[in-house]
Curated annotation (Swiss-Prot):
One of its GO terms (biological process) is defense response to fungus. Belongs to the frog skin active peptide (FSAP) family. Brevinin subfamily. It comes from the Eukaryota. Disulfide bonds join C60-C66. It comes from Amolops jingdongensis (Chinese torrent frog). InterPro entries: Frog_antimicrobial_propeptide (IPR004275). The keyword GTP-binding does not apply. It holds the Pfam family FSAP_sig_propep. GO terms for molecular function: antioxidant activity. The keyword Ribonucleoprotein does not apply. Its main location: secreted. It is found in: Secreted. This is Jindongenin-1a.
Length: 66
C-alpha cells in the first residue's frame, strides 16, 4: 500500500501545480483581453475620425466648395 501512496501523492502534487499555473495563465489572458479591448476601441475611434475626414474631403472635391 505504501508503494502506491508515493506515486499518488506525486501525481496529486503535480496536478495541483499544473492547475495553479493554468489559473495564473488564464488570469493573465483576462488582463490582456481588457487591454486588447481598449486598443480596439481606440483604433475604431481613429477609424471613425479618418472616415469622417475622407468623407469631408470627398464632399469638398465633388462640390468644389472648399
Amino acid at each position: 500500500m505504501f508503494t502506491l501512496k508515493k506515486p499518488l501523492l506525486l501525481l496529486f502534487f503535480l496536478g495541483t501545480v499544473s492547475l495553479s499555473l493554468c489559473e495564473q495563465e488564464r488570469a493573465a489572458d483576462d488582463d490582456e483581453g481588457e487591454v486588447i479591448e481598449e486598443e480596439v476601441k481606440r483604433d475604431s475611434m481613429g477609424a471613425v475620425k479618418l472616415a469622417k475626414l475622407l468623407i469631408d474631403k470627398m464632399k469638398c472635391e465633388v462640390t468644389k466648395a472648399c
